[in-house]
Amino acid sequence: MKESTQQFLALTSPGIEVLLFDEIKSLGAFNVIQKPEGVYFQASLALGYKISLWTRLATRIMLKLGEGEAKDKDELFKAASSINWPDIFKSTTTFAVDFVGYSEEIRNSQFGGLTIKDAIVDQFRDQGFERPNVDKKAPQISFQARLLRDNVTIFLDFSGRGLFQRGYREHSGAAPLKENLAAALIIRSGWLNDTSKPLVDPMCGSGTILIEAVSMAAKQAPAINRQSWGFEAWLSHDNAVWQKQLTLAIDSSEENMSNLKVKVFGIDIDERVLRTAQQNARNAQLHQYIEFTCKNTNDMDNTFGQPGTILFNPPYGERIGELPELVENFVLFGQKLKMQFKDWRIAILTANVDLLSMLKLSSFKRYKFKNGPLDCQLALYNLDAKQGAKDAINPQSDFAEEDSAFANRLKKNRKNLKGWLKSNEIEAYRLYDGDIPEYNVAIDIYGEYLVIQEYAAPKTIEEDKAKKRLQEVIYWAPKVLNIPTDKVILKTRAKQRGANQYERLEKTKQSLTINEHGALFKINLWDYLDTGLFLDHRKTRQIVAKKSQGKSLLNLFAYTGSVSVQAAVQGAASITTVDMSNTYLNWAEDNFALNKLNGHKYQFIQADCLDWLKKNVNKFDVIFIDPPTFSNSKRMEDSFDVQRDHVDLITDALKSLNRGGEIFFTNNKRNFKIDFEALDELGLTAEAMSDVTRDKDFARNKHIHNSWSIKRTAT
């Protein structure tokens, strides 16, 4: 008699669906259909058990219980009620409902799940059973409802917790690769076509790819050691049929292991992570088939025998500071491959496809995957005679320093500034500022650190070209300047409006100290787009400080108070520092403390500078004003535009200026035009200072800032 079949749904990660379709068919399922949400198939109960034990690519196996229209809450409740729940599980069994999808009437998963839960509980109560309890954290049985186009399908979570959890991984690295994705990568790499050839993971982390590969080569059932299953509390579960399938899977796996002969190698630079990989391999009882070595990938030599496959999942360079080292590693790794790994297959998974260009190799195939929330590609390369033929003797010629216009310009700029830097004892300066339009970056030096700021490419530049140029910059800058890649910080700078330039990027709370003309400044290169010190105003700080000796200074829009600090160090009589941000005002106080400056003559005021200036009754000898180009902060009643409002700002500042006093006014608005006529009506004379306040490292950029000295007109 033919066994009755039921409909199942196998879920997986995006990019794996096609492979899962093939796998489910190969395991004997009927009517296999691939859809965006997963792979549907018909199977007997025995085959459902078998597929759950043998699938490597599914994350879950779901068993269909029923379906129905669900345009609104009432229809959803009715569809859930059409299933006889006391036939599914006992009232003493805890349960949970997961809901996927939404519609105009059913707008969130919590509402949908609650409606189905109510239908289940009501049905038990109406049939005279005890009310079953919900347990969201550790239910004994789980259900999933999937809403699509006003139709809901309700499933039993047949397999239970994620099938990718094989049970051998106790610990993992910072960015673990799920086992089902690792299996998909192994299939796509082609290594399974001939497992007698070596497989190498040069950045093996916790060993997932290697353990999964050995298990696949041995034709093991991946779930035979699983301790719990979703169907165990299901009333139609047939334990005799299940035990038969489990025994068959165990026996088959043990028999296949006896014939296993593989050469698999794992390499990682992190000894701690490598110990984890070794323990995971022991847990999987596959440690004897994997040779682990602790070393840098770029120190890896080809001692693996015949050509095989290199498959790995390198870091993606998502965090500040990671990318420069990765760029260099990819360049070196590409050179290593050309020199030592002829006729090998290379497979690399990355979310940063731009890094692949640094290999200087041509991929013959790319597959799209999702690694968690990240869009990734698996790039495949065959290192045949065509790959790198022009560089067979000297692969480094791909990156010849003498051929790089950017590298040559960097060396030229460094040479031009060398004497000036030495004579002025300058620790923080700009070395490059978009000198070559194709390399649209700014490069700053802060002591032993290198900061690369990528300017957003104009729309006329192709995105791929801009990314390629940036990779060259990241590669060459630390090399030319002899700065280790772990001392390189990369930032992207688009046009900033208002307070955007002060938004937090990271939360490292790291800082370093920079000395500028005898004043010490706290610098943070990691957490914000700007560092706490505007380098282009180095000379401005000197001029204002000298003008303020023995005088009172008001510093408006003070940021981290660098002008105030320099003035205090050089002997200002009193200083009032005003800024709207508590964060930056605290930073200003840190700068004062760093220079051992304290006392009542230094005041720090957190306020909207525009509003404070209107109410201020004190007078100052020198006023420094460096407003934003535009601001509409939540703390401000009105917006501020420096072109539109600069006369009003200076008018208000004039009321706080002592007779014989001086206002230093500066801003960063390109094409700014000061209103001389309006200032003249106020009895003021403005002297352009921009050429004077630009120091040598900013001499190439005449638009970096605008500055004026404003005084009352002599009568």
UniProtKB/Swiss-Prot annotation:
EC number of the protein: 2.1.1.173, 2.1.1.264
GO molecular function: 23S rRNA (guanine(2445)-N(2))-methyltransferase activity; RNA binding; rRNA (guanine-N7-)-methyltransferase activity
Disulphide-bridged cysteine pairs: none
Methyltransferase among keywords: yes
Cellular component terms (Gene Ontology): cytoplasm
Domain THUMP: 47-158
Coiled coil: none
Protein name, per record: Ribosomal RNA large subunit methyltransferase K/L
Underlying gene: rlmL
